[in-house]
Each structure stands twice: as structure tokens, then as C-alpha cells.
Amino acid sequence: DVEQLVGLLHAEEVLEQGDIPTMAGGSYVVVEFSPMDGFDHIRNGIYRLQAAGYQPVLAHAERYRCVSSSMEKAGELYGMGCYIQVNADSIMGANGWQVRHFARMLLKKRMAHFVATDAHDDMRRAPCLVNCVKYIGRHFGEDYMAQLFQVNPSRIIADEYIDAMV
């Protein structure tokens, strides 16, 4: 069961308490905001986590209107060291063509670090990655596919630095 840090207000509380749920007990945290949150709110939340020594992974970046409206804004988050996760179903088009287009642009520009399912457990929204893995391997290369699905997740578990995507 993966816990994620939801939004800046909750982040403020847990930052003060020093009790942030991390992935595999390391420094990486999954952070999720409301799709309606503004860019400054998201950027500030990520910055505060980084300043506290955490490595934020922005969950389903393609679903935030303020991010998906501009590759420059996504680039700003990427440039400040925020790790970017996109959902497999978004890549495959289940969330509309605009979300699909932006998710695929993140892949094309090598700005995504992870692909996930958004399945918070194995009962609801069951994980299904097979078609997405094949798609990414065909369209973006086997090496990048391995980074997204194997190498980078392994580095989170080991609490190791994740290299820039190339």
C-alpha cells in the first residue's frame, strides 16, 4: 500500500511534524495536488519538500491543468529537480486526447521519470501496464522504457539518485 502526500496544506502539517510517508523508507515522496491547483501552489509545495530534504515525485503530472497547459511549466518543475510520473492510462488515451498528447510529449522530451497505474490498491483501478509498456518500447525505445519501469523504480527502493533522462 503506497501512501502519498496530498497537497500543500497537508504537506505543511506533516512537514512541521516531520512525519512524511516516504517510498521504501527513503527520501522519495509521492505528492499529489488537486487538478485545479495553481502552478505557484504546486511549485511551492515541491520546493518546500525539497528544502526539507525530500525528493518529490509529482503524481500524474499530465492531469494538472496548470502544468499540462504549458511545456515550459513542466520544464520548470523538471528543471528544479522534481521527478515526474505519468499514468499509463493517460498515455494510452483513457483520459482524453489532450491528456494523452501532453503525457506523450513528456515522454518524447524525456521529462517523465516513471509510469504508474494510479491503482491505489489491487481491488479498485486494478493495475494494467502491459499495453503501455509495449507502446513506450515501440515509440520511445527499449532503453527509455527500462528506465521508466525498472531502473528508476529500483533506484527509489535503494534511495539512490535518479539520473536525468536521455
Label the model's feature ranges.
Residues 1-85, 163:
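Extended substrate/RNA-proximal surfaces in nucleic-acid metabolism proteins
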Residues 7, 63-67, 91-94, 120-124:
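Active-site environment of divalent metal-dependent phosphoester hydrolases
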Residues 45, 73-77, 102-106, 132-136:
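A general structural detector for well-ordered alpha-helical segments in enzyme core domains, enriched
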Residues 60, 118, 153:
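Conserved, mostly hydrophobic/aromatic
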Residues 83-86, 91-93:
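Aromatic-anchored helix/helix-loop segment that forms the rim or "lid"
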Residues 96-102:
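Short loop-to-alpha-helix "cap/lid" segments that border enzyme active sites
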Residues 111-127:
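Short acidic/histidine-rich active-site segments
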Residues 129, 133-166:
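Mid-to-C-terminal alpha-helical segments outside catalytic/metal-binding sites
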